[in-house]
Amino acid sequence: MDFHNILVMASEQQGLNAVPKRYSLAVGPPKKVPKVKGVESAAVQAFLRRKEEEKRKKELEEKRKKERLLAKRIELKHDRKARAMASRTKDNFYGYNGIPVEEKPKKRRRTCENVSQAPEAEYATENEAEQLEFAQTESEYEQEEYDEKPSKAAVKPKAPPKSAPAPLNFADLLRLAEKKQYEPVEIKVVKKIEERPRTAEELREREYLERKNKRVETQKKKSEKEVKSAGISSSSKKATSLKECADAKLSRSAADKHAPPKSSLSSLSGTDKKPKAPALTEKHSRSFSSSKLSQMEKGKTSQNSSLKSPAAGSHSKLPANGMGKTGSSFPVPSSKPMANGAQRLPSAKESSLKKPVHTKPGNAAALQHETNSSAKRPSSSLGKGGSGHPAGGSSAGPGRSSSNSGTGPGRPGSVSSPGPGRQGSSSAAGPGRPSSSSSLGPGRLGSGSGVGPGRPGGSSSTGLGRPGGSSGTGPGRPGNSTNTAPGRLGSGMGTGPGRPGVGPSAGPGRPGSSSGTGPGRPGVSPSAGPGRPGLTAVKPRCTVVSETISSKNLVTRPSNGQINGMRSPPGHRPVFRPQGIGRPPVGYKRQIDDDDDDDEYDSEMDDFIEDEGEPQEEISKHIREIFGYDRKRYKDESDYALRYMESSWREQQKEEARSLRLGVQEDLEELRREEEELKRKRQSKKLRTR
């Protein structure tokens, strides 16, 4: 727009605005408001409407608040219940005997709720008005509950109480007394259960006995079923009765056998056990003859195994001195033999209990086969003189070295083959079992628990100039050795009275030879002459492991290494494997492999330290000096017992108190020593100053 036009328009407007507006300052007449008598309807209606609106709003607000409070109360109830449950379970966690918590009657419970809800009302509300309101709603709510409950109660009428049985007349009582007069009264004897923790051995014994009882019961049931179903002839009846009788006898003998190892574990000395050996052989022979009966085949196998296993336990108690004892004696299947019968076997009981666990019904057929075969043929290791003696105790359960003990009068120890030029592989005595008779030089007796008059049993080695097929082990030692060509003893040949032998004792000219005696002479049982029992010269190397960890529950059996002709590594212990059907004899194979093995000369092994020459006492002495541990002072615990060790609170407290007392004593001794040292120093200072 132009500036000129603007000016023109402004000038035009100027003339119009020139006349000013004027207001009169005079006061006008007063206005009169007309007064109406009565109430103005419009104002009242407006006021009432406002009031109603406010009321409605208030009610809505109240309703919302009430709902909110009720929801809160339900929530609180849940929380309280949860809290109560949590606290109850925490408080009652110990000492809960399985007694259910008594429910209070409903009225009392409701009053409790009322009491507990009063403080919650305060907690839930913000101001007094709300509190009042909450109390009202609460009471309403409770009234509703009261109304509901009686109606429910009215629906369920109470069951009439059972009337007590009518009391007997005096005459009836007398009659009943006459009737019952001569009837025997059964008094139930309450068995006192010992409230003490059982040892591992006891637990195992209990399991074994339970299993045996079950077996007997099942057999009885089977026989009864057969009797019922077949409508049996008298002959079959006789057979079953025979079977039951035999079962009962066997179980009784097994139970009897169980008791002596347990009771006479520590008290009986080695010499007390001498008369037991012949009786045991008789028992074995009896069991073999009975095993031939085809009728009782299945029933007997399991019982035979249970009979033999405790018997083996008592074998293991026979001492190792053969002085003046020419009866049949057995090599012992425990892993710790004794020297000269002085040291008792603590593992006798344990081995006897361990064995039944392994002889399961699954192995029954194999057991039967073993018993039959060994009963029918005499052991192959019998020499010219011993061909008439069948192996008395040669059949044992799996995992037991068979003892080919000759029962002839002049035959100490296990059966030996004295003929020269004979290879004595006695592994044919029973399939898959290490046999305890060995091939011998002329005039030498075999390895057994009693080896000639006055000669303690180490294992005797090969004869002159011939390889021995299977090792003769001393009592209870795993036979790791395989006798080889002249001048050489097989690996871990004979061991001393202490440990399972593993260390290879070599003959002259071999690396690491420590006990090379003359060619073919036994380096193990060097009895210096009749009447002087010489201790065995070659003793196994010992590691700390074999010193501290007990090797009791290992059942003796040569490991696979030996079977394949390999030497077992140092520190290796034979492992028990339950076998069903045994392996064929492997004496010849072992001999060939071992020859090859020995001919190989390993230059790297020149500087390998072998301490097999050191006697056991020497090693024990070193360990005692280093660790302050004397193995003679401690009772040998099996790994099983240690794993399942149980002790009561009182025992623990006793132990605590004892250790505390010892600790205090040690502290006092230390203080005394320190004081003595100080005194000595002072005295020495005084002497110097003078």
From Swiss-Prot:
Lineage summary: Eukaryota, Metazoa, Chordata, Craniata, Vertebrata
Chief place of localization: nucleus
Record text about domains: The acidic C-terminal domain mediates interaction with histone H3/H4 complexes.
Compartments it resides in: Nucleus, Nucleolus
Family in the record: Belongs to the SPT2 family.
Native source organism of the sequence: Gallus gallus
Feature: compositional bias, Gly residues: 383-396, 443-457, 465-477, 489-521
Bias type Low complexity, positions: 229-243, 397-442
Gene for this chain: SPTY2D1
Protein's recorded name: Protein SPT2 homolog
Subunit structure: Interacts with POLR1A. Interacts with histones. Interacts with a heterotetrameric complex formed by histone H3 and H4, especially when the histone tetramer is not bound to DNA.
A GO-annotated cellular component: nucleoplasm
